[in-house]
Amino acid sequence: MSSVAKVPLYERPSDYVFDMTTLNSADAKRLWRAAIKEAWNNRCAYCGATPITNNSLTIDHVRAKSRGGQDCTSNVIPACRRCNQEKASLEWVAWFRLQPFYSIVAEWRIREWLRTGEVPAFDSDEETAVWFNSILSEAV
């Protein structure tokens, strides 16, 4: 039985070359993007959609590259092609809060990812509520 090794998630694509996971930058970027998508269970961070093909799940720069955003894990999230194109170079929170699929829980998941590089995982609505209440109590 063959098993597929989980790709580690590094802060930057170049870290895959430095760690000798790969020897070229194109493979490094591909591995980095795959690890980000895998961390989010191959779902759009904004609308939660699971795209039909891997190509339709893109990587969105939360702070657009045109506004100085970098290629680093703390600035990118997986987004379906539709969300990525609609957001374009807009400020993510302002854009996201105007969407019909907006969710405060999704916003806080994105914020946690940008802060820590980890996606809070929940098995139930109760677990989500407990986590969200802990975030709110920390903010107060």
PLM region spans:
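A detector for short metal-coordination/catalytic motifs
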Residues: 74-75, 82-140
